[in-house]
Amino acid sequence: QNLPGNDNSTATLCLGHHAVPNGTLVKTITNDQIEVTNATELVQSSSTGRICDSPHRILDGKNCTLIDALLGDPHCDGFQNEKWDLFVERSKAFSNCYPYDVPDYASLRSLVASSGTLEFINEGFNWTGVTQSGGSYACKRGSDNSFFSRLNWLYESESKYPVLNVTMPNNGNFDKLYIWGVHHPSTDKEQTNLYVRASGRVTVSTKRSQQTIIPNIGSRPWVRGLSSRISIYWTIVKPGDILLINSNGNLIAPRGYFKIRTGKSSIMRSDAPIGTCSSECITPNGSIPNDKPXQNVNKITYGACPKYVKQNTLKLATGMRNVPEKQTRGIFGAIAGFIENGWEGMXXGWYGFRHQNSEGTGQAADLKSTQAAIDQINGKLNRVIEKTNEKFHQIEKEFSEVEGRIQDLEKYVEDTKIDLWSYNAELLVALENQHTIDLTDSEMNKLFEKTRRQLRENAEDMGNGCFKIYHKCDNACIGSIRNGTYDHDVYRDEALNNRFQIKGVELKXGYKDWILWISFAISCFLLCVVLLGFIMVXCQKGNIRCNICI
């Protein structure tokens, strides 16, 4: 490309930055849409569609809920003593044993899920005077009537049901979880047939708590051929405490205890398949990468996950302001510096030089300023991800119907947190983008000022990011300017002489222009005088007559 006004005694040096034909629009504090050469998406908006089995230990509940597996529903026997980091409950899960309810279902489910194990220890409870291991046709184990494997249904023996008083100390150094229940017969006859007395009572106590349950006799909706129910309760016995069970009927007794562990295990409802892959972050939609600071896939997560935001996209600028190179630059096709536009095709760096001298034209990148900008931008992305990745999981929130107001409050708090974080994320990205553009502009200005200080009076700033050098500057001379070893004293006298000669020519060309304008003005004036004289002579001789009508 030709830089006009050059000859063998001068040279032109332009400074510029790279550009791309089609940049990416990002948001800054001062501008909703500004084009940059490159940007990185910060919001993960899609999942893999499957739950990865590594590095977390995933336990697929299949047809069983966690509570059914805990109680020992016959079709969930395969889950006995299992362990997990994440228990995945399926929508197809069902109960296939005696119909039951858990008054504090959500709390029990959460407690067992966070423990991460169904490890069970049998204990030798002494149930004297009653029949043990009752079963039901509604709970088949194979072809036999059966019951929950972790519970012991006690009923009359020889038409007697004595008052039961059983104690079990906790001599271990861990918490014990006991699951027990109360049977609610559908009729008074069923009550007396099973427990002799017309009304039973169950009391379970520790040093810290006591629960007394009176059975509610009455018919309920039929489930698996039964209108009676079992209510499931649970008691935690601390180390050094004692479990005391007192009952005169209707007791569904524990067979032992579950070990309670403290951990970060959890449970998630999902129908996504489990695949052989690795991902730190899991959502009900499937696993997602956690290399981005934010995600828009699902509010519920497990593992080290990006924060959930409402935005579908947030782009972090990882390049400089993009000013595409103009395809034509006047009739001479001259290039310009960074003030007018960027340069496309500069692959070796972000900033660089273009020159024209007696040896031709050339281009070279400035690696030092390029590296300075890249180092600062690379640090940005890593810091944003580091600050925003969750190191814990967002569990599902469940409440019973009687806790509806608490559920509404929880939902409001969660929605407010999401709104707040979404706003903060957008603001953070806008601030970082503004800083990125400012720092890349700053590196360009630093390089330009560094070049200006080297050239001093040997060159003139052309106002477009270029310098007109007033001495002969071959490729070696241009190279010294680029690498900072240029000695302006060596070329000072030559530059001053050339500058005066060139300015003198420009001055003479300026006088010529003035003379041309003055000559044109005088010619026009004389033409007007001649025309006016002709009109006056003609009027005197009567050749021209003017009539004025009023």
UniProtKB/Swiss-Prot annotation:
Site entry: Cleavage: R329, G330
PTM text: Palmitoylated. In natural infection, inactive HA is matured into HA1 and HA2 outside the cell by one or more trypsin-like, arginine-specific endoprotease secreted by the bronchial epithelial cells. One identified protease that may be involved in this process is secreted in lungs by club cells.
Cellular component aspect of the GO annotation: host cell plasma membrane; membrane; viral envelope; virion membrane
Residues spanning the membrane: 515-535
UniProt main location, coarse: virion
Pfam families, per the entry: Hemagglutinin
Membrane topology field: Single-pass type I membrane protein
Compartments in which it is found: Virion membrane; Host apical cell membrane
Annotated signal sequence range: none
GO biological process terms held by the UniProt record: clathrin-dependent endocytosis of virus by host cell; fusion of virus membrane with host endosome membrane; fusion of virus membrane with host plasma membrane; virion attachment to host cell
Database matches in Gene3D superfamilies: 3.90.20.10, 3.90.209.20
SUPFAM superfamilies per UniProt: Influenza hemagglutinin (stalk), Viral protein domain
Glycosylation sites: N8, N22, N38, N63, N126, N165, N285, N483
Record-linked InterPro entries: Capsid_hemagglutn, Hemagglutn_HA1_a/b_dom_sf, Hemagglutn_influenz_A, Hemagglutn_influenz_A/B
One example GO MF annotation: host cell surface receptor binding
Keywords noted in UniProt: Clathrin- and caveolin-independent endocytosis of virus by host, Clathrin-mediated endocytosis of virus by host, Disulfide bond, Fusion of virus membrane with host endosomal membrane, Fusion of virus membrane with host membrane, Glycoprotein, Hemagglutinin, Host cell membrane, Host membrane, Host-virus interaction, Lipoprotein, Membrane, Palmitate, Transmembrane, Transmembrane helix, Viral attachment to host cell, Viral envelope protein, Viral penetration into host cytoplasm, Virion, Virus endocytosis by host, Virus entry into host cell
Miscellaneous comment as given in the Swiss-Prot or TrEMBL entry: Major glycoprotein, comprises over 80% of the envelope proteins present in virus particle.
Protein family per UniProt: Belongs to the influenza viruses hemagglutinin family.
UniProt subunit comment: Homotrimer of disulfide-linked HA1-HA2.
Purpose of the protein: Binds to sialic acid-containing receptors on the cell surface, bringing about the attachment of the virus particle to the cell. This attachment induces virion internalization either through clathrin-dependent endocytosis or through clathrin- and caveolin-independent pathway. Plays a major role in the determination of host range restriction and virulence. Class I viral fusion protein. Responsible for penetration of the virus into the cell cytoplasm by mediating the fusion of the membrane of the endocytosed virus particle with the endosomal membrane.
The name this protein goes by in its record: Hemagglutinin
Naturally occurring in which organism (per UniProt): Influenza A virus (strain A/Bangkok/1/1979 H3N2)
Gene this chain is encoded by: HA
